[in-house]
């Protein structure tokens, strides 16, 4: 069965949308439409800018008028998000802050930030389903699927540019909380170890410390000690894939329930202690940045979920 958009749509390009390629713009306008179809309608000249045919690499300018034709899409593509409607609804409950420029949410553990790698649903797809009227919603940064906590989304292209610049210039501070094995030594305040990313034959990404890798630095502070574990605050100076997880492992203190870099005996200890923990104990607790619209310095905190809180309560009772 096919569905069809009702009519031709004319979109006027705002100043903060200028500079992006027409193919990327169409992907935000025609949600759920395959890239192959977008390139097909461009190639056929069905998409016009200022009544003229354009190439996929054309960069939009402020004031351009884009003609978007009705697009037929297989119903299954239109409804790709439908099995995840409960997750979409749940996203509305974890929004921490929102204005005209940004949206900040407390990402649940187990939800990917975007679809891909066999996943049809991610936070960004969920937000677009939740806010179908939004013209622009893009991730500013990423969190691993099993990591929970503060996730920043831009609602304007100008906001995305500003926040990406802050990331590049190290003007954004991220604080994570991690439960690690054993007693973290207080004098270990920084781990500097270059990280190299490898792709296994299975397609799985694995990161290891290697002199051939990229320079990487994480700062650590002990928050609380327990009988056989430590809660540490981790502040990455660089932003490498799996950085905190690999740096804690390298320091001899892997994170609880880390299926890639963890320690099964430590996980078993936590299970036997009755903590009820079944997920990676890595939580993006706070994010400090300069607001792209007002210039104000903001610090947004995300509370831990019930599972993490209960785990710490049990460990405190046994300390």
From Swiss-Prot:
GO molecular function terms listed in the Swiss-Prot or TrEMBL record: 23S rRNA pseudouridine(955/2504/2580) synthase activity; RNA binding
Protein name: Ribosomal large subunit pseudouridine synthase C
Free-text function comment from the UniProt entry: Responsible for synthesis of pseudouridine from uracil at positions 955, 2504 and 2580 in 23S ribosomal RNA.
Catalytic residues (UniProt): 144
InterPro entries reported for this sequence: PsdUridine_synth_cat_dom_sf, PsdUridine_synth_RluA-like_CS, PsdUridine_synth_RluC/D, PsdUridine_synth_RsuA/RluA, RluA_PseudoU_synthase, S4_RNA-bd, S4_RNA-bd_sf
Top-level class of the enzyme under EC nomenclature: isomerase
Gene that specifies this protein: rluC
Residue span(s) of domain S4 RNA-binding: 20-83
Similarity-based family: Belongs to the pseudouridine synthase RluA family.
